[in-house]
A protein has these predicted regions:
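Active-site-proximal loop/turn and secondary-structure-junction residues that shape catalytic pockets
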Residues: 10-12, 35-37, 66-69, 93-97, ...
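Active-site groove signature of glycoside hydrolases
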Residues: 81-102, 123-133
Length: 184
């Protein structure tokens, strides 16, 4: 089922309570809470945000962690996703574009990705890579390769620098593993 929701970072300057109020007014049913502003790891706010969200009849669709595959310790990010009741955790596929990484770097990132997918699956959480420039998801070729190398899912968003036909083709390719479409 498709449901309209909100990514909390759209309103970085608002509190979670203000975001929930805006969502209720707009008739939205779900939210992806951002880990860089609204639910930071270790801040012990995830459980509180979950209670508030669910108390208003809304659901958390994902935790936008901003975890990047080069970082260590994925566990604290998973702890936050679990405390939020998020079925999906959004992560970034590195800090460099696919053309900038050598084979060793790519293999290391994919190994880390697969480890993250395994850890998350143990908690019934799905790892979803954000489709984003300057990461391993910056090209259709690289994404197709990731689909062969890993069981990851994808948070797709349109590339503003691609023609419409290219965007639609890229979206169709990830549909079998699509967890979310970001539109803006």
């Amino acid at each position: 089922m498709n449901r309209a929701g909100l990514v909390s970072i759209t309103f970085r300057n608002k509190t979670p309570r203000e975001i929930v109020a805006l969502m209720k007014r707009a008739g939205l049913s779900q939210v992806e809470w951002g880990g860089d502003v609204h639910v930071k790891p270790g801040a012990e706010s995830a459980a509180e945000v979950r209670r508030m969200t669910e108390g208003e009849g809304l659901r958390t669709s994902a935790y936008g962690s901003y975890y990047r595959l080069e970082e260590n310790a994925f566990g604290p990010w998973l702890d936050e996703a679990e405390a939020l009741g998020a079925p999906v955790i959004r992560v970034w596929a590195g800090r460099k574009g696919s053309a900038e990484v050598d084979e060793w770097e790519r293999e290391t990132l994919v190994h880390t990705l697969n480890d993250c997918v395994r850890q998350a699956a143990e908690r019934n959480i799905v790892v979803s890579l954000e489709y984003h420039p300057n990461t391993l998801t910056d090209s259709r070729d690289s994404v197709r390769r990731l689909m062969r190398e890993s069981e990851t899912s994808f948070h797709w968003q349109p590339r503003w620098d691609w023609p419409e036909e290219e965007r639609l083709a890229a979206l169709k390719e990830v549909v079998p593993r699509l967890t979310c479409v970001h539109t803006f």
